[in-house]
């Protein structure tokens, strides 16, 4: 929650202004693997530009350097794996811009990003160092089958002789509201 650069949110550890730059340190995260599943309301890895001090966050929002810290189990680097910040704030990419660096002294992965004021939702994922494979949440976030996701279903039709598909229907489904008892 980076909507204010005057007041610290519950996820901020510290906030300092150095010269013309606001430095924000997010509270360190640890592995959630093996912990009981807890539903956290989220925005599925997205972000929204918002500011509590202005009317229009696109014009009046400020920027800050934000330090993210992830402590792996035993404070040891994952063998053969890189840890990445994963979400819309890194364009869901597993590249050098999202890769966290392991700090041997602290025993933690760290990454600093220059972000505009807003609300950011993200996860930590691992990717093989050989760059082949898919993001894996199980080492960092745990693997919980009962999580909430949003799906968009698009139905296309291509008439005989046509050169392009036509969108004839769409719907949005949320797995959270499909489960009994919710």
Where is each model-derived feature located?
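Aromatic-rich carbohydrate-binding modules that target alpha-glucans
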Residues: 67-117, 129-159
């Amino acid at each position: 929650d980076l909507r204010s650069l005057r007041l610290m949110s519950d996820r901020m550890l510290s906030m300092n202004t150095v010269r013309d730059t606001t430095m924000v340190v997010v509270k360190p995260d640890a592995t959630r693997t093996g912990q009981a599943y807890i539903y956290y309301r989220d925005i599925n890895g997205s972000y929204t530009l918002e500011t509590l001090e202005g009317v229009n966050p696109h014009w009046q929002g400020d920027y800050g350097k934000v330090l993210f810290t992830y402590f792996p189990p035993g404070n040891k680097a994952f063998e053969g794996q890189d840890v990445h910040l994963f979400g819309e704030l890194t364009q869901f990419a597993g590249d050098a811009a999202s890769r966290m660096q392991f700090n041997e002294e602290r025993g933690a992965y760290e990454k600093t990003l220059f972000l505009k004021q807003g609300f950011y939702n993200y996860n930590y994922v691992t990717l093989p160092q050989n760059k082949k494979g898919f993001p894996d949440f199980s080492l960092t976030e745990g693997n919980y089958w009962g999580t909430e996701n949003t799906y968009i279903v698009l139905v296309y039709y291509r008439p005989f002789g046509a050169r392009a598909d036509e969108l004839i229907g769409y719907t949005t489904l949320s797995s959270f509201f499909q489960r009994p008892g919710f």
